[in-house]
């Protein structure tokens, strides 16, 4: 479920090296980069020791995180028009801490990612100062200690490590002779359906019906997928991203739809010094 894109900064004297990668386990990945355990990227060996300056989390799937990572590493090669308009981002030939922070802030405002509800955990004061100086979006950042990583990981599960298992059991129970709470038609498996994640609510709906309901509520006729909406039964506010995450089966996770124990390929990662 949890998968983040991180920015490393070298703590080596006189080094200005930075490094962008992705992982489901930031603490373990940092130990790998610093040579404490096997599996660190070869490209980061010369600039050890490293620290995690910040990471972005809240991605709907692992694939989404990997796509975001690639653009963050290669902003000059992006095909996103709203990102290409920022010459200070796409004209960079050599990555620095400033260019990485600036690119991240701009990306979060782009149409491709602004509706994902991504969050930035900042662990380094220098990154925080740059963020404020560049007047980047402040509603998505959180200044915290790297010791808080586990709580951030759990936040992307809905706050409970067993949350997904609970949701899967609930879906299995509700899917038996189910009726859509919106169109009132039968939900015939294996169609894609969504359930309210709250334990005391039995709302179940076709994904298309629920998306249309949320978009109508938001008076949004420009997008296909919503950000959030009100449950048709319990009237609580629901996050579309969490609804979709709760609907993914273990096989979806195995196929890479959700973060697993693997890391991003070294060929996709980039270090600049």
Curated annotation (Swiss-Prot):
GO terms for molecular function: 5'-flap endonuclease activity; crossover junction DNA endonuclease activity; ds/ssDNA junction-specific dsDNA endonuclease activity; zinc ion binding. PROSITE patterns: GIY_YIG. A zinc finger (SLX1-type) spans 180-234. It is found in: Nucleus. GO terms for cellular component: rDNA protrusion; Slx1-Slx4 complex. Residues 250-273 are annotated as: Disordered. InterPro entries: GIY-YIG_endonuc (IPR000305), GIY-YIG_endonuc_sf (IPR035901), Slx1 (IPR027520), SLX1_C (IPR048749), SLX1_endonuclease (IPR050381), Znf_RING/FYVE/PHD (IPR013083). It comes from the Eukaryota. Its EC number is 3.1.-.-. It is an enzyme of class 3 (hydrolase). Catalytic subunit of the slx1-slx4 structure-specific endonuclease that resolves DNA secondary structures generated during DNA repair and recombination. Has endonuclease activity towards branched DNA substrates, introducing single-strand cuts in duplex DNA close to junctions with ss-DNA. This is Structure-specific endonuclease subunit slx1. It comes from Schizosaccharomyces japonicus (strain yFS275 / FY16936) (Fission yeast). The lineage of its organism: Eukaryota, Fungi, Dikarya, Ascomycota, Taphrinomycotina. The gene is slx1.
């Amino acid at each position: 479920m949890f998968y983040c894109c991180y920015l490393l900064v070298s703590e080596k004297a006189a080094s200005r090296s930075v490094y962008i990668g992705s992982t489901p386990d930031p603490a373990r990945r940092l130990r790998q980069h610093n040579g404490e355990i096997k599996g660190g990227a070869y490209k980061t060996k010369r600039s050890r020791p490293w620290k995690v300056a910040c990471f972005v989390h809240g991605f709907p799937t692992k694939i989404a995180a990997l796509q975001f990572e690639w653009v963050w590493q290669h902003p000059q090669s992006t095909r996103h028009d709203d990102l290409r308009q920022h010459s200070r981002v796409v004209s960079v030939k050599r990555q620095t801490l400033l260019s990485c922070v600036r690119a991240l802030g701009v990306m979060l405002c782009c149409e491709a990612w602004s509706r994902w509800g991504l969050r930035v955990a900042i662990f380094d004061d220098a990154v925080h100062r740059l963020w404020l100086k560049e007047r980047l979006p402040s509603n998505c950042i959180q200044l915290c200690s790297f010791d808080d990583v586990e709580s951030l990981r759990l936040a992307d599960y809905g706050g409970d490590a067993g949350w997904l298992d609970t949701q899967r059991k609930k879906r299995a129970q509700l899917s038996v002779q189910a009726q859509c709470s919106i169109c009132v038609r039968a939900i015939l498996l294996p169609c894609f359906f969504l359930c309210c994640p709250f334990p005391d609510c039995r709302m179940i709906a076709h994904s298309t019906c629920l998306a249309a309901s949320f978009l109508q509520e938001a008076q949004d006729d420009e997008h296909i997928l919503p950000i959030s909406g009100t449950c048709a039964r319990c009237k609580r506010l629901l996050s579309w991203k969490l609804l979709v995450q709760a609907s993914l089966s273990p096989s979806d996770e195995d196929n890479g739809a959700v973060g697993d124990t693997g890391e991003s390929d070294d060929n996709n990662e980039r270090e600049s010094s």
